[in-house]
Amino acid sequence: PQRGDIVVINRYTDEPLIKRVIFMGGSFFKPGNVTPTAEFNWWFDPEAARIVVRTPFREQIMVGLDVCEKMPFSSDRYQAFLAGQRPEMKKLLESTYAGQQFAKDKAFSQYVWDVLAAAILIDPSLITEERTCAVDVNAEFGPSYGQALAYPDNGPQGSQKARIVMTIDQERFWNMLTAR
């Protein structure tokens, strides 16, 4: 959820050293994961999400379900990831909820939403397809509460342009996670 981002925005919005802001959240061109129209983070607090995406940063990159749900973290990937870890890290990973699920069910998979956003922060060249749109969040209570909105041209007053990530170089991403 975006509420903590508001504290940072109120303090640092005009900071000239902020080159870009990368958000994990929203689902612009596909169904949501908690309602038919909303992704969890923006549905949980759409008013905060709206303030955040309307902040006039020089560059905004949105990492939503549009890209995140194209690349599940499968059992095979998890095992490959474990193989490259030190014993103490391997033990820690195996003790997590995901580690326990992978041990019980070889068909288990999950998405790595925040990890993907962090990887793009480290290396924006991972992005291979994006759409630049004015973005907004529906903060009106109702069936589409928390819906991520994208406008190819101009959006409502106050909305800002953002790069919505659609596809990344998956091979480079997974290699980044397993590299030592």
Predicted region positions:
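Conformational coupling and interaction surfaces
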Residues: 40-47, 60-180
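Active-site histidine-anchored catalytic micro-motif
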Residues: 1-70, 75
